[in-house]
Curated annotation (Swiss-Prot):
Keywords: Cell wall biogenesis/degradation, Glycosidase, Hydrolase, Secreted, Signal, Virulence. One of its GO terms (cellular component) is extracellular region. Its main location: secreted. It comes from Candida albicans (strain SC5314 / ATCC MYA-2876) (Yeast). Residues 173-185 have a biased composition (Gly residues). The gene is TOS1. Residues 158-172, 203-222 have a biased composition (Low complexity). Belongs to the PGA52 family. This is Probable circularly permuted 1,3-beta-glucanase TOS1. Its EC number is 3.2.1.39. Residues 1-21 form the signal peptide.
Length: 467
Protein backbone atom coordinates (compact mmCIF):
# COMPACT_ATOMS: atom_id res chain seq x y z
CA UNK A 1 0.00 0.00 0.00
CA UNK A 2 1.25 3.47 -0.87
CA UNK A 3 1.14 6.25 1.67
CA UNK A 4 1.21 9.88 0.60
CA UNK A 5 2.17 12.85 2.72
CA UNK A 6 -1.51 13.81 2.71
CA UNK A 7 -2.43 10.44 4.21
CA UNK A 8 0.25 10.80 6.87
CA UNK A 9 -0.89 14.30 7.77
CA UNK A 10 -4.50 13.12 7.96
CA UNK A 11 -3.48 10.33 10.31
CA UNK A 12 -1.48 12.68 12.52
CA UNK A 13 -4.37 15.13 12.55
CA UNK A 14 -6.76 12.37 13.60
CA UNK A 15 -4.40 11.26 16.38
CA UNK A 16 -4.02 14.84 17.61
CA UNK A 17 -7.80 15.27 17.65
CA UNK A 18 -8.17 12.05 19.59
CA UNK A 19 -5.76 13.14 22.28
CA UNK A 20 -7.26 16.60 22.53
CA UNK A 21 -10.75 15.12 22.79
CA UNK A 22 -9.67 13.19 25.85
CA UNK A 23 -10.06 9.75 24.31
CA UNK A 24 -8.15 6.87 25.87
CA UNK A 25 -6.10 4.11 24.24
CA UNK A 26 -6.80 0.74 25.86
CA UNK A 27 -5.98 -2.74 24.66
CA UNK A 28 -5.09 -1.53 21.18
CA UNK A 29 -8.28 0.49 20.68
CA UNK A 30 -9.35 4.10 21.21
CA UNK A 31 -12.37 4.84 23.38
CA UNK A 32 -13.89 8.28 23.78
CA UNK A 33 -17.09 8.86 25.77
CA UNK A 34 -19.70 6.62 27.33
CA UNK A 35 -22.95 6.79 25.40
CA UNK A 36 -26.49 5.45 25.56
CA UNK A 37 -26.96 5.48 21.80
CA UNK A 38 -25.06 5.09 18.51
CA UNK A 39 -26.64 6.29 15.25
CA UNK A 40 -25.68 5.19 11.74
CA UNK A 41 -26.92 7.56 9.02
CA UNK A 42 -26.91 7.23 5.24
CA UNK A 43 -26.59 3.45 5.31
CA UNK A 44 -27.15 1.52 2.11
CA UNK A 45 -25.49 1.67 -1.31
CA UNK A 46 -25.34 -0.01 -4.70
CA UNK A 47 -22.66 -2.63 -4.88
CA UNK A 48 -21.72 -6.27 -5.30
CA UNK A 49 -20.32 -9.08 -3.21
CA UNK A 50 -19.24 -12.61 -4.07
CA UNK A 51 -21.96 -15.13 -3.25
CA UNK A 52 -21.17 -18.81 -2.64
CA UNK A 53 -22.66 -21.14 -5.27
CA UNK A 54 -21.07 -24.47 -4.31
CA UNK A 55 -19.07 -26.12 -1.51
CA UNK A 56 -17.07 -29.25 -2.35
CA UNK A 57 -16.81 -31.36 0.81
CA UNK A 58 -14.09 -33.56 -0.69
CA UNK A 59 -11.68 -30.77 -1.67
CA UNK A 60 -12.66 -28.01 0.74
CA UNK A 61 -12.99 -25.60 -2.19
CA UNK A 62 -15.89 -23.29 -2.94
CA UNK A 63 -17.11 -21.40 -5.98
CA UNK A 64 -18.64 -17.93 -6.03
CA UNK A 65 -20.45 -15.56 -8.34
CA UNK A 66 -21.07 -11.83 -8.20
CA UNK A 67 -24.28 -10.72 -6.51
CA UNK A 68 -25.64 -7.17 -6.89
CA UNK A 69 -27.60 -5.20 -4.31
CA UNK A 70 -28.92 -1.67 -3.82
CA UNK A 71 -31.30 0.34 -1.68
CA UNK A 72 -31.69 1.67 1.82
CA UNK A 73 -29.60 -0.22 4.39
CA UNK A 74 -28.31 -2.67 1.76
CA UNK A 75 -26.86 -5.19 2.16
CA UNK A 76 -28.18 -5.19 5.76
CA UNK A 77 -31.75 -5.26 4.45
CA UNK A 78 -31.07 -8.89 3.54
CA UNK A 79 -31.69 -11.71 5.99
CA UNK A 80 -29.61 -11.34 9.15
CA UNK A 81 -28.64 -13.90 11.78
CA UNK A 82 -28.09 -12.83 15.41
CA UNK A 83 -24.90 -14.01 17.12
CA UNK A 84 -23.88 -14.18 20.77
CA UNK A 85 -20.47 -14.86 22.34
CA UNK A 86 -19.80 -15.48 26.02
CA UNK A 87 -19.52 -14.75 28.79
CA UNK A 88 -23.17 -13.84 28.33
CA UNK A 89 -26.62 -14.64 29.72
CA UNK A 90 -29.54 -13.89 27.42
CA UNK A 91 -32.81 -13.06 29.18
CA UNK A 92 -34.92 -11.62 26.35
CA UNK A 93 -34.73 -11.38 22.58
CA UNK A 94 -37.34 -10.18 20.11
CA UNK A 95 -37.86 -9.00 16.55
CA UNK A 96 -40.55 -6.55 15.45
CA UNK A 97 -41.80 -5.50 12.03
CA UNK A 98 -44.18 -2.70 11.02
CA UNK A 99 -47.70 -4.04 11.46
CA UNK A 100 -48.35 -3.59 7.74
CA UNK A 101 -45.10 -5.31 6.73
CA UNK A 102 -44.91 -8.56 4.81
CA UNK A 103 -41.49 -9.50 6.17
CA UNK A 104 -42.70 -11.98 8.76
CA UNK A 105 -41.01 -15.37 8.59
CA UNK A 106 -43.66 -17.13 10.63
CA UNK A 107 -44.78 -20.54 9.41
CA UNK A 108 -47.97 -21.41 11.25
CA UNK A 109 -48.03 -24.96 9.95
CA UNK A 110 -44.44 -25.75 10.90
CA UNK A 111 -44.18 -27.44 14.29
CA UNK A 112 -40.69 -26.04 14.77
CA UNK A 113 -42.26 -22.57 14.92
CA UNK A 114 -44.74 -23.24 17.71
CA UNK A 115 -44.26 -21.67 21.12
CA UNK A 116 -42.21 -24.13 23.18
CA UNK A 117 -41.98 -24.22 26.96
CA UNK A 118 -39.65 -26.35 29.00
CA UNK A 119 -38.74 -26.26 32.65
CA UNK A 120 -36.75 -24.08 33.52
CA UNK A 121 -12.07 -8.64 16.95
CA UNK A 122 -14.83 -9.39 15.68
CA UNK A 123 -15.74 -12.91 15.90
CA UNK A 124 -17.22 -14.43 13.04
CA UNK A 125 -15.86 -14.72 9.61
CA UNK A 126 -12.12 -14.76 9.97
CA UNK A 127 -9.98 -15.60 6.96
CA UNK A 128 -7.36 -17.63 8.82
CA UNK A 129 -8.39 -20.84 10.52
CA UNK A 130 -6.66 -22.35 13.52
CA UNK A 131 -7.29 -25.92 14.62
CA UNK A 132 -8.31 -25.49 18.23
CA UNK A 133 -10.09 -28.69 19.16
CA UNK A 134 -10.34 -32.33 18.28
CA UNK A 135 -13.91 -33.52 18.03
CA UNK A 136 -15.11 -37.08 18.53
CA UNK A 137 -18.66 -38.10 17.72
CA UNK A 138 -19.60 -41.13 19.81
CA UNK A 139 -22.02 -43.89 18.88
CA UNK A 140 -24.95 -41.89 20.23
CA UNK A 141 -24.16 -38.91 18.06
CA UNK A 142 -22.79 -36.83 20.91
CA UNK A 143 -19.89 -34.48 20.33
CA UNK A 144 -16.93 -34.88 22.69
CA UNK A 145 -14.12 -32.35 22.47
CA UNK A 146 -10.59 -32.21 23.74
CA UNK A 147 -8.94 -28.89 24.05
CA UNK A 148 -5.70 -29.04 22.47
CA UNK A 149 -13.88 7.04 13.68
CA UNK A 150 -15.01 10.37 14.16
CA UNK A 151 -18.00 10.55 16.47
CA UNK A 152 -20.28 13.44 17.31
CA UNK A 153 -23.00 13.81 19.91
CA UNK A 154 -26.17 15.17 18.35
CA UNK A 155 -29.75 15.93 19.21
CA UNK A 156 -32.03 14.21 16.74
CA UNK A 157 -34.95 16.02 15.15
CA UNK A 158 -38.25 14.60 13.87
CA UNK A 159 -38.65 13.97 10.17
CA UNK A 160 -40.88 12.34 7.62
CA UNK A 161 -40.89 8.58 7.45
CA UNK A 162 -38.99 6.62 4.84
CA UNK A 163 -40.47 3.73 2.93
CA UNK A 164 -39.17 0.26 3.69
CA UNK A 165 -37.41 -1.67 0.97
CA UNK A 166 -37.62 -5.42 0.54
CA UNK A 167 -34.49 -7.32 -0.26
CA UNK A 168 -34.11 -9.45 -3.36
CA UNK A 169 -33.44 -13.01 -2.32
CA UNK A 170 -30.51 -14.62 -4.05
CA UNK A 171 -31.00 -18.17 -5.14
CA UNK A 172 -28.54 -20.85 -6.06
CA UNK A 173 -28.06 -24.53 -6.28
CA UNK A 174 -25.16 -26.62 -5.22
CA UNK A 175 -23.90 -30.11 -4.81
CA UNK A 176 -21.63 -31.87 -2.40
CA UNK A 177 -21.73 -34.78 -0.08
CA UNK A 178 -21.07 -35.16 3.61
CA UNK A 179 -17.66 -36.66 4.06
CA UNK A 180 -16.18 -38.26 7.12
CA UNK A 181 -14.55 -41.36 8.45
CA UNK A 182 -16.42 -44.27 9.90
CA UNK A 183 -15.31 -43.41 13.41
CA UNK A 184 -16.51 -39.84 12.95
CA UNK A 185 -13.63 -37.88 14.37
CA UNK A 186 -11.11 -35.36 13.19
CA UNK A 187 -9.68 -31.90 13.77
CA UNK A 188 -12.02 -29.03 13.02
CA UNK A 189 -11.81 -25.27 13.04
CA UNK A 190 -13.11 -22.99 15.75
CA UNK A 191 -15.96 -25.15 17.00
CA UNK A 192 -16.55 -22.80 19.90
CA UNK A 193 -16.15 -19.69 17.78
CA UNK A 194 -12.55 -18.91 18.55
CA UNK A 195 -11.02 -16.33 16.29
CA UNK A 196 -10.82 -12.55 16.34
CA UNK A 197 -14.11 -10.79 16.46
CA UNK A 198 -13.15 -8.69 13.48
CA UNK A 199 -10.22 -8.18 11.15
CA UNK A 200 -7.52 -6.13 12.81
CA UNK A 201 -6.88 -4.05 9.72
CA UNK A 202 -10.39 -2.63 9.82
CA UNK A 203 -10.84 -2.36 13.56
CA UNK A 204 -11.92 0.80 15.32
CA UNK A 205 -8.36 1.55 16.34
CA UNK A 206 -7.67 2.73 12.79
CA UNK A 207 -10.74 4.95 12.60
CA UNK A 208 -10.87 8.72 13.10
CA UNK A 209 -11.23 9.32 16.79
CA UNK A 210 -12.15 12.92 17.52
CA UNK A 211 -15.36 13.67 19.38
CA UNK A 212 -17.12 17.00 19.10
CA UNK A 213 -20.54 18.43 19.87
CA UNK A 214 -22.32 19.73 16.78
CA UNK A 215 -25.87 19.79 15.42
CA UNK A 216 -27.10 16.96 13.26
CA UNK A 217 -26.51 17.55 9.57
CA UNK A 218 -29.62 15.62 8.54
CA UNK A 219 -33.05 14.85 9.87
CA UNK A 220 -33.73 11.65 11.73
CA UNK A 221 -36.03 8.88 10.53
CA UNK A 222 -39.49 8.50 12.00
CA UNK A 223 -42.15 5.82 11.69
CA UNK A 224 -45.89 5.73 11.10
CA UNK A 225 -47.94 3.12 12.88
CA UNK A 226 -47.39 0.30 15.34
CA UNK A 227 -44.90 -2.55 15.19
CA UNK A 228 -45.81 -6.19 15.80
CA UNK A 229 -43.55 -8.70 17.53
CA UNK A 230 -42.75 -11.54 15.14
CA UNK A 231 -40.20 -13.57 17.14
CA UNK A 232 -39.58 -13.75 20.87
CA UNK A 233 -37.46 -15.61 23.42
CA UNK A 234 -37.30 -15.82 27.17
CA UNK A 235 -35.40 -18.61 28.98
CA UNK A 236 -37.08 -21.91 28.26
CA UNK A 237 -39.52 -20.50 25.71
CA UNK A 238 -39.26 -19.62 22.01
CA UNK A 239 -41.83 -18.18 19.65
CA UNK A 240 -40.90 -18.25 15.95
CA UNK A 241 -37.16 -18.41 16.49
CA UNK A 242 -34.56 -21.16 16.79
CA UNK A 243 -31.19 -21.50 18.55
CA UNK A 244 -28.32 -22.99 16.54
CA UNK A 245 -24.63 -23.58 17.21
CA UNK A 246 -21.66 -25.28 15.56
CA UNK A 247 -21.96 -28.91 16.66
CA UNK A 248 -22.95 -30.30 13.28
CA UNK A 249 -22.88 -34.10 13.27
CA UNK A 250 -24.13 -34.27 16.85
CA UNK A 251 -27.84 -34.94 16.55
CA UNK A 252 -28.27 -32.58 13.60
CA UNK A 253 -26.22 -31.02 10.86
CA UNK A 254 -23.09 -32.55 9.35
CA UNK A 255 -19.34 -32.80 9.84
CA UNK A 256 -16.59 -33.19 7.24
CA UNK A 257 -12.81 -33.24 7.36
CA UNK A 258 -12.57 -30.19 5.09
CA UNK A 259 -15.26 -27.91 6.46
CA UNK A 260 -15.63 -29.21 10.01
CA UNK A 261 -18.93 -28.84 11.87
CA UNK A 262 -21.94 -27.27 10.19
CA UNK A 263 -24.74 -25.51 11.99
CA UNK A 264 -26.75 -27.71 14.34
CA UNK A 265 -29.65 -27.27 16.72
CA UNK A 266 -28.31 -26.15 20.10
CA UNK A 267 -29.19 -28.14 23.19
CA UNK A 268 -30.76 -26.47 26.22
CA UNK A 269 -27.51 -25.14 27.72
CA UNK A 270 -25.57 -24.74 24.44
CA UNK A 271 -23.05 -27.39 25.49
CA UNK A 272 -23.69 -29.49 22.40
CA UNK A 273 -26.05 -30.28 19.57
CA UNK A 274 -29.62 -31.52 19.53
CA UNK A 275 -31.71 -33.54 17.10
CA UNK A 276 -34.61 -31.08 17.33
CA UNK A 277 -35.09 -27.37 18.12
CA UNK A 278 -34.80 -26.75 21.87
CA UNK A 279 -35.36 -23.43 23.67
CA UNK A 280 -32.26 -22.22 25.48
CA UNK A 281 -32.59 -22.37 29.24
CA UNK A 282 -31.32 -19.51 31.38
CA UNK A 283 -27.63 -20.25 31.05
CA UNK A 284 -24.39 -18.31 31.07
CA UNK A 285 -22.18 -19.35 28.18
CA UNK A 286 -18.45 -19.21 28.81
CA UNK A 287 -15.82 -17.14 27.04
CA UNK A 288 -15.46 -18.09 23.39
CA UNK A 289 -18.69 -20.08 23.25
CA UNK A 290 -21.28 -18.94 20.74
CA UNK A 291 -24.82 -19.53 19.57
CA UNK A 292 -26.98 -18.02 16.86
CA UNK A 293 -30.66 -17.11 16.62
CA UNK A 294 -32.52 -17.48 13.32
CA UNK A 295 -36.21 -17.08 12.57
CA UNK A 296 -38.46 -20.10 13.01
CA UNK A 297 -38.88 -20.56 9.26
CA UNK A 298 -36.87 -23.33 7.60
CA UNK A 299 -35.13 -22.77 4.30
CA UNK A 300 -36.99 -24.57 1.53
CA UNK A 301 -35.76 -27.06 -1.01
CA UNK A 302 -36.18 -24.47 -3.75
CA UNK A 303 -33.17 -22.55 -2.44
CA UNK A 304 -35.27 -19.67 -1.14
CA UNK A 305 -32.38 -18.88 1.21
CA UNK A 306 -29.78 -18.86 -1.54
CA UNK A 307 -27.09 -21.54 -1.58
CA UNK A 308 -26.34 -23.23 1.74
CA UNK A 309 -24.13 -26.11 2.78
CA UNK A 310 -25.60 -29.54 2.09
CA UNK A 311 -26.76 -31.21 5.31
CA UNK A 312 -26.56 -28.09 7.47
CA UNK A 313 -29.47 -26.93 9.62
CA UNK A 314 -30.75 -24.03 7.50
CA UNK A 315 -33.26 -21.41 8.60
CA UNK A 316 -34.25 -17.99 7.33
CA UNK A 317 -32.81 -14.94 9.03
CA UNK A 318 -34.55 -11.63 9.76
CA UNK A 319 -35.00 -9.56 6.59
CA UNK A 320 -36.18 -6.14 5.54
CA UNK A 321 -35.19 -2.48 5.66
CA UNK A 322 -37.62 -1.85 8.53
CA UNK A 323 -37.12 -4.06 11.57
CA UNK A 324 -36.41 -3.76 15.28
CA UNK A 325 -34.33 -6.10 17.44
CA UNK A 326 -34.64 -6.03 21.23
CA UNK A 327 -32.34 -7.60 23.80
CA UNK A 328 -31.90 -8.09 27.51
CA UNK A 329 -28.63 -9.67 28.60
CA UNK A 330 -25.87 -9.85 31.18
CA UNK A 331 -22.14 -9.99 30.45
CA UNK A 332 -20.54 -11.20 33.69
CA UNK A 333 -16.78 -11.31 34.10
CA UNK A 334 -15.04 -14.59 33.30
CA UNK A 335 -11.47 -14.74 34.61
CA UNK A 336 -11.17 -18.54 34.60
CA UNK A 337 -9.11 -18.96 31.48
CA UNK A 338 -6.60 -17.41 29.14
CA UNK A 339 -7.82 -18.51 25.71
CA UNK A 340 -8.47 -16.36 22.69
CA UNK A 341 -11.54 -14.12 23.16
CA UNK A 342 -11.28 -14.72 26.91
CA UNK A 343 -13.75 -12.44 28.73
CA UNK A 344 -14.68 -10.69 25.46
CA UNK A 345 -18.46 -11.06 25.06
CA UNK A 346 -20.28 -9.78 22.00
CA UNK A 347 -23.64 -9.47 20.27
CA UNK A 348 -23.59 -8.97 16.51
CA UNK A 349 -25.49 -9.43 13.25
CA UNK A 350 -24.31 -11.22 10.12
CA UNK A 351 -25.72 -11.65 6.67
CA UNK A 352 -27.44 -15.00 7.26
CA UNK A 353 -25.78 -16.50 4.19
CA UNK A 354 -22.48 -16.55 6.10
CA UNK A 355 -23.29 -19.10 8.83
CA UNK A 356 -25.36 -21.16 6.41
CA UNK A 357 -22.17 -21.74 4.40
CA UNK A 358 -18.97 -21.33 6.47
CA UNK A 359 -18.64 -18.67 9.15
CA UNK A 360 -15.12 -19.68 10.13
CA UNK A 361 -12.69 -20.96 7.54
CA UNK A 362 -11.79 -20.59 3.87
CA UNK A 363 -12.64 -17.03 2.81
CA UNK A 364 -14.17 -18.07 -0.52
CA UNK A 365 -16.70 -20.26 1.31
CA UNK A 366 -18.70 -17.29 2.56
CA UNK A 367 -19.54 -13.82 1.32
CA UNK A 368 -18.10 -12.08 4.41
CA UNK A 369 -14.74 -10.99 3.01
CA UNK A 370 -16.40 -9.43 -0.03
CA UNK A 371 -18.71 -7.26 2.04
CA UNK A 372 -22.12 -8.92 2.40
CA UNK A 373 -22.49 -7.37 5.82
CA UNK A 374 -21.75 -7.54 9.53
CA UNK A 375 -22.93 -5.14 12.21
CA UNK A 376 -21.41 -5.36 15.67
CA UNK A 377 -24.01 -4.18 18.16
CA UNK A 378 -22.43 -4.62 21.59
CA UNK A 379 -18.87 -5.93 21.47
CA UNK A 380 -16.04 -6.04 23.99
CA UNK A 381 -12.73 -5.71 22.11
CA UNK A 382 -10.21 -6.63 24.80
CA UNK A 383 -10.18 -9.12 27.63
CA UNK A 384 -11.85 -7.83 30.78
CA UNK A 385 -12.90 -4.51 29.29
CA UNK A 386 -16.13 -2.91 30.50
CA UNK A 387 -16.66 -1.03 27.23
CA UNK A 388 -18.92 -2.28 24.41
CA UNK A 389 -18.60 -0.74 20.95
CA UNK A 390 -20.55 -0.89 17.70
CA UNK A 391 -19.02 -1.21 14.23
CA UNK A 392 -20.23 -1.83 10.67
CA UNK A 393 -18.25 -4.05 8.30
CA UNK A 394 -19.23 -3.93 4.64
CA UNK A 395 -18.14 -2.23 1.43
CA UNK A 396 -19.81 1.15 1.88
CA UNK A 397 -17.24 3.83 1.18
CA UNK A 398 -14.77 1.29 -0.19
CA UNK A 399 -14.19 -0.66 -3.38
CA UNK A 400 -16.52 -3.33 -4.77
CA UNK A 401 -16.37 -6.84 -3.29
CA UNK A 402 -14.73 -5.58 -0.10
CA UNK A 403 -15.52 -5.30 3.60
CA UNK A 404 -12.94 -2.57 4.11
CA UNK A 405 -15.61 0.12 4.22
CA UNK A 406 -18.21 0.64 6.90
CA UNK A 407 -17.22 2.43 10.08
CA UNK A 408 -18.43 3.05 13.58
CA UNK A 409 -18.17 5.08 16.74
CA UNK A 410 -15.52 5.05 19.44
CA UNK A 411 -18.03 6.11 22.01
CA UNK A 412 -19.04 3.06 24.00
CA UNK A 413 -21.81 1.44 26.02
CA UNK A 414 -21.06 0.29 29.56
CA UNK A 415 -20.83 -3.48 29.78
CA UNK A 416 -23.38 -5.03 32.19
CA UNK A 417 -21.09 -7.12 34.39
CA UNK A 418 -23.70 -6.98 37.17
CA UNK A 419 -27.34 -6.40 36.42
CA UNK A 420 -28.88 -6.50 32.97
CA UNK A 421 -28.68 -4.36 29.83
CA UNK A 422 -31.76 -3.70 27.72
CA UNK A 423 -30.94 -2.74 24.16
CA UNK A 424 -32.94 -1.80 21.08
CA UNK A 425 -31.73 -1.77 17.46
CA UNK A 426 -33.94 0.05 14.95
CA UNK A 427 -33.52 -0.28 11.17
CA UNK A 428 -35.57 2.41 9.42
CA UNK A 429 -35.08 4.39 6.22
CA UNK A 430 -31.33 4.68 5.74
CA UNK A 431 -30.56 4.78 9.46
CA UNK A 432 -29.71 2.32 12.22
CA UNK A 433 -30.24 3.38 15.84
CA UNK A 434 -28.63 1.28 18.59
CA UNK A 435 -29.61 2.37 22.07
CA UNK A 436 -29.81 1.37 25.69
CA UNK A 437 -33.30 1.71 27.16
CA UNK A 438 -34.57 1.92 30.73
CA UNK A 439 -34.69 -1.21 32.86
CA UNK A 440 -38.46 -0.73 33.18
CA UNK A 441 -38.98 -0.99 29.41
CA UNK A 442 -41.26 -3.87 28.45
CA UNK A 443 -40.94 -5.70 25.15
CA UNK A 444 -44.58 -6.62 24.69
CA UNK A 445 -46.47 -8.10 21.75
CA UNK A 446 -46.39 -4.72 20.00
CA UNK A 447 -44.61 -1.37 20.08
CA UNK A 448 -46.63 1.77 19.45
CA UNK A 449 -45.61 4.56 17.09
CA UNK A 450 -45.00 7.01 19.94
CA UNK A 451 -42.53 4.69 21.68
CA UNK A 452 -40.51 3.95 18.55
CA UNK A 453 -40.36 7.60 17.47
CA UNK A 454 -39.26 8.61 20.97
CA UNK A 455 -36.37 6.15 20.69
CA UNK A 456 -35.46 7.50 17.26
CA UNK A 457 -35.43 11.11 18.51
CA UNK A 458 -33.07 10.45 21.40
CA UNK A 459 -29.64 12.07 21.12
CA UNK A 460 -26.70 9.84 20.38
CA UNK A 461 -23.20 9.40 19.01
CA UNK A 462 -23.17 9.48 15.20
CA UNK A 463 -20.91 6.93 13.53
CA UNK A 464 -18.54 7.86 10.71
CA UNK A 465 -18.94 5.70 7.60
CA UNK A 466 -16.50 5.04 4.79
CA UNK A 467 -13.30 6.28 6.39
Amino acid sequence: MKFSSTTLLAGLSSLTATVSAGCSFEGGNYYCSETKKVIYKGIGFSGTYMDVTNMDESTGKCTQQSYSFSGNLSPLDEELSVHFRGPLTLLQFGVYYPSSSGNSKRQIDDQDCNVKHVHHKHKRATEVVQVTQTVFVDGNGNTVTSQALQTSTVESSPAVSSAAADDNANSGSGSGSSAGSGSGYGSVSALDGEGKAYRSDISTKSAPTSTSAQPSSSETASVDGAWTRDSYYTPGSTDNCVFLNYHGGSGSGVWSAKFGNSLSYANADNSGGSSTPVPLEETTIKSGEEYIIFSGSKCGSSSDCGYYRKGTVAYHGFKGASKIFVFEFEMPSDTNGNGYNQDMPAVWLLNAKIPRTLQYGEATCSCWKTGCGELDLFEVLSSGSNKMISHLHDGQGSSQNSNNGGGGSQDYFERPTSGTFKGVVIFEGDEIHILQVDDETEFGSSLDEETVNAWLKEAGSVATIGY
